[in-house]
UniProtKB/Swiss-Prot annotation:
Descriptive protein name: Probable septum site-determining protein MinC
Purpose: Cell division inhibitor that blocks the formation of polar Z ring septums. Rapidly oscillates between the poles of the cell to destabilize FtsZ filaments that have formed before they mature into polar Z rings. Prevents FtsZ polymerization.
Subunit structure: Interacts with MinD and FtsZ.
TM segment ranges: none
The encoding gene: minC
Family that this chain belongs to: Belongs to the MinC family.
Stored HAMAP family: MinC
Pfam (any one): MinC_C
InterPro entries noted in UniProt: CAP/MinC_C (IPR016098), MinC (IPR013033), MinC_C_sf (IPR036145), MinC_N (IPR007874), Septum_form_inhib_MinC_C (IPR005526)
GO biological process: cell morphogenesis; division septum assembly; regulation of cell division; regulation of cell septum assembly
Keywords, in A-Z order: Cell cycle, Cell division, Septation
């Protein structure tokens, strides 16, 4: 029996949500450009859902926002939290209207493997622990990236980027002896350096998800 020419299957993906809190596109783009400069590769080509719940202006220039994001190689795939007028505007632009769904109560499968490295990870290097945790006995330098489908443990300074729960595991954590990261991310929720500095003093800590927000906890001495 020949295979059908197409199949329609259900699947779930982790998407970043861009919250727009101002109708002033110049101000929005100036702030976005500042964030992109801190982690350009992380956002490059990233599909975004735009949350417009803070925008009540029905004349908001959604087309202009879409074009400005495209010029920065960011792609709007849909909007959420919009007024009826803005939702209609989105439909004419070919954007999906996304409704926030309830989180699944079924926990993801536990990582099956652990990748252990006894070395420093230098600028330009990338390490990925697929289907498991990543343990590094060393430092992660500026410009380096460490990624794991499970948790990340760094017995040294974290100065680069660390992305745990890359496959969507919201129970993953990032632990480091010194939190000085350019970017940290768990299951798609991320902090840039400026966010991390507000919650940490370059000391050891454990970053995890609390609902849909990242938090950092001190490690016992």
């Amino acid at each position: 029996m020949s295979k059908p020419s197409l199949e329609l299957k259900g699947a779930s993906f982790t998407l970043s949500v861009l919250h727009i809190n101002s109708s002033d596109l110049n101000a929005v783009m100036a702030e976005l450009d500042s964030k992109l400069a801190q982690a350009p590769q992380f956002f490059l080509g990233a599909p975004l859902v735009v949350n417009l719940s803070a925008i009540q202006d029905n004349d908001f220039n959604l087309h202009g926002l879409k074009e400005l994001l495209l010029s920065r190689q960011l792609v709007i795939v849909g909007i959420t939290g919009a007024t009826t007028a803005l939702s209609n505007q989105a439909k004419t632009l070919g954007l999906a209207i996304v409704k926030a769904g309830k989180q699944s109560v079924t926990p993801p499968p536990a990582p099956r493997q652990t990748k252990v490295l006894k070395q420093n990870i230098r600028s330009g290097q990338q390490v990925y622990a697929k289907n498991g945790d990543l343990i590094i006995f060393g430092a992660v330098g500026n410009g380096a990236e460490v990624i794991a489908d499970g948790s990340i443990h760094i017995y040294g300074a974290l100065r680069g980027k660390a992305m745990a729960g890359a496959a969507g595991d919201s129970s993953a954590v990032i632990i480091a002896h010194s939190l000085e990261a350019e970017l940290v991310s768990i299951a798609g929720q991320y902090w840039l350096a400026e966010n991390l500095q507000q919650h940490s003093s370059d000391k050891s800590g454990c970053i995890r998800l609390n609902g849909e927000s990242l938090i950092v906890e001190s490690l016992p001495l």
